[in-house]
Structure formats: C-alpha cells, structure tokens
C-alpha cells in the first residue's frame, strides 16, 4: 500500500500503519459525504482511532436519523467509486486561516488559534473537500 505524506511525497506505507491510514482516509470520505449532504456542516476533529474513526460535526439543529446515516453511507460509497485523487498541501498560517474561514470551518479556525506556535498547516484535498490535518 502506498501513502501520501503531508509534504507530498509518496512511499510504501509501513505495514503496521496501514489500518490507521485506511481509517484516516475513511474519516475524510465520511466528512466529504456529510458536507455534500449537509453543506452547513461545521467539522471539528476526525481522527482515526485504535478501533475505527469518527468525526465531531456540528449540524446545527439537524438531528441525524437512521435513514440519514444510511444516506451518508451511500454517499461514501459514491465518493469511493469516484476514485478521487488525494492531494496534500501546506499553507502558511494566514492563508490556512483564510481558507478555513472561507469554507465556514469555524472549529478548525478556533483550533488553529489554539496552536499559536504553528506557522503552517497541512491539508488534504479530495475533489471539492479540503480537510486540515494536524
């Protein structure tokens, strides 16, 4: 399995990290699916974990139903079939904040403010979806 690192280089993924990479990518696909179905969604964190992955997302007053979850899963399958390239890029702080503000990612902007020592931030883009990765 190949992996794209934050600096853009591609290399073989160490076997002991493969599951983590798959889960991290799945979190991005899920977030992209949610954003397509709920454009107002504001994402906080979405890490891979030891047992899977999750994403904290603010949907305002929207409460997800079982049907909504099934629709998110269908959209995830659709995104996977699109075989979108994953493109890493790094931005200096000011540009990173501007990008997240333009995309209405308020929790990401807030998180960047908490990381005062960071001068640049890593992002991954797949199709129309862009996610910040710390």
List each model region and its residues.
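Auxiliary tRNA-acceptor-end handling modules of aminoacyl-tRNA synthetases
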Residues: 1-22, 30-33, 42-48, 54-134
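TRNA-recognition modules of translation machinery and tRNA-sensing kinases, especially anticodon-binding
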Residues: 25
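Metal-associated gating/positioning segment near the N- to mid-region
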Residues: 36
